[in-house]
């Protein structure tokens, strides 16, 4: 069986934070869902939520025993990107490094293609 390239990277830092949050919720069925919606100052914005289920066509990326889930519509905007977790002066948050974004807003939560 040939290896299939995963179109989205789920970093160790993000996976470890998800693992911690799932442990706090005491629900091992939870997965981090990343999605794109219209809005924000640049046209599209990233969203993050926890979800117990997956839907037909969802991409599932696993790291350290936890799962990142992306729906097919959102995935087309995220191919080649990285979902990471950062802690700094601006606070702690999940972030998306998206090579498809032509512009991003200052807070990094919205982008345009």
UniProtKB/Swiss-Prot annotation:
Q: List the disulfide bonds.
A: none
Keyword Magnesium among record annotations? no
What is one GO cellular-component annotation here?
A: cytosol
Q: Does the keyword Iron-sulfur apply?
A: yes
Give the GO molecular function terms: 2 iron, 2 sulfur cluster binding; 4 iron, 4 sulfur cluster binding; iron ion binding
Alphabetical list of PROSITE patterns matching this protein: HESB (PS01152)
Q: Which cofactor does it need?
A: iron-sulfur cluster
Transmembrane segments annotated in the record for this chain: none
Question: Which key words are in the record?
Answer: Iron, Iron-sulfur, Metal-binding
What are its GO biological-process terms?
iron-sulfur cluster assembly
Residues binding iron-sulfur cluster, per UniProt: 41, 105, 107
Q: How is the cofactor bound?
A: Binds 1 iron-sulfur cluster per subunit.
Question: Pfam families in the record, alphabetically?
Answer: Fe-S_biosyn
| Gene3D superfamilies recorded | HesB-like domain
Matching PANTHER family: IRON-SULFUR CLUSTER ASSEMBLY 2 HOMOLOG, MITOCHONDRIAL
| Family stated for the protein in its record | Belongs to the HesB/IscA family.
* Role description: Required for insertion of 4Fe-4S clusters for at least IspG.
Q: What does the subunit comment say? A: Homodimer.
Name of this chain's protein: Iron-sulfur cluster insertion protein ErpA
